[in-house]
Design a protein with these regions (language model features):
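A ligand-binding cleft/hinge motif common to bilobed small-molecule-binding domains
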Residues: 78, 94-104, 152, 173, ...
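Ligand-binding cleft/hinge of the Venus flytrap
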Residues: 42-46, 57-67, 130, 143-164, ...
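Periplasmic-binding protein-like
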Residues: 34, 112-120, 184, 188-232, ...
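Short helix-initiation/N-cap motifs at beta->coil->alpha
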Residues: 69-81, 125-126, 145, 160-174
Length: 252
């Protein structure tokens, strides 16, 4: 009888420890700005994060052994601040690699290439080049690569600064701006989802190409290496190609 009690106690102890282990999920906390479709945005009438970057990060995290990704929604201009103070382990938010950002954070290998383009009202014409923006009211999202490019290539007095790409489009539609400079992948999605009757691309070319990557804290070299190992494999997979088709319509 005593032996049976010992066996039962051992079983209960083992079961309890197993239960504790299951409760301790390995969670990857990631900063993002969820107002940049199709990269990251909120599902309508929901608190669910969706988008290309969201799915990409979940897939990478799973490959790296994480049980869950916890996304932290932060204003775009404060994303790197939060990474430096370690509020999260990584940032994914359509973030282009720039020398200024590289001085503060470490970037993974790029996972997609994007580019800037001019968007203008339907029925108007404008060459898709920097010279076209002279004396034009140009809408652009604050703290973005587009903002930096516009500041260097246009009259600063004519810039209409917005908090999102969608706000910039609305500024053009409402005649608060003559045109906008924006991520081509992002605006292509918006044009396909409700804005094609109002605005259009100025041309098929791009003004400036940029590479998009995940940012991590400079001292977290282990996490950076893990991301790069999985990106090398994932970005050549069928899953990645399907993800691109889902959000961009074709392989980029």
């Amino acid at each position: 009888m005593k032996r049976l009690c010992i066996i039962v106690c051992c079983f209960l102890l083992a079961w309890g420890l197993a239960g504790c282990g299951n409760d301790e999920k390995k969670v990857l906390r990631v900063g993002t700005t969820a107002n940049f479709p199709p990269f990251e945005y909120m599902k309508p009438n929901s608190d669910m994060y969706i988008g290309f970057d969201i799915d990409l990060m979940k897939n990478l995290a799973s490959l790296m052994g994480y049980d869950e990704v916890e996304f932290v929604n932060v204003e775009f201009q404060k994303l790197i601040d939060g990474l430096e103070t370690k509020k999260y382990y990584a940032v994914i938010s359509g973030l282009a690699i720039t020398p200024e950002r590289e001085a503060r954070v470490a970037f993974t290998k790029p996972y997609i290439t994007d580019g800037l383009t001019i968007v203008l009202p339907v029925g108007t014409k404008l060459p898709n080049e920097a010279a076209s923006l002279r004396r034009k009211r140009v809408a652009v999202e604050s703290s973005s690569i587009a903002f930096d490019w516009v500041m260097k290539n246009t009259n600063h007095n004519n810039i209409v600064v917005t908090e999102s790409t969608e706000e910039a489009i609305k500024a053009v539609i409402d005649n608060k701006a003559d045109c906008m400079v924006v991520s081509k992948l992002s605006v292509a999605y918006l044009l396909a989802n409700g804005f094609s009757d109002s605005v259009r691309f100025a041309g098929d070319n791009i003004l400036f190409a940029d590479e998009i990557a995940i940012a991590v804290n400079k001292d977290n070299k282990e996490l950076l290496q893990k991301f790069n190992v999985e990106l090398d494999k994932y970005c050549t997979s069928a899953s990645y190609r399907n993800l691109c088709r889902t959000y961009f319509g074709s392989m980029k």
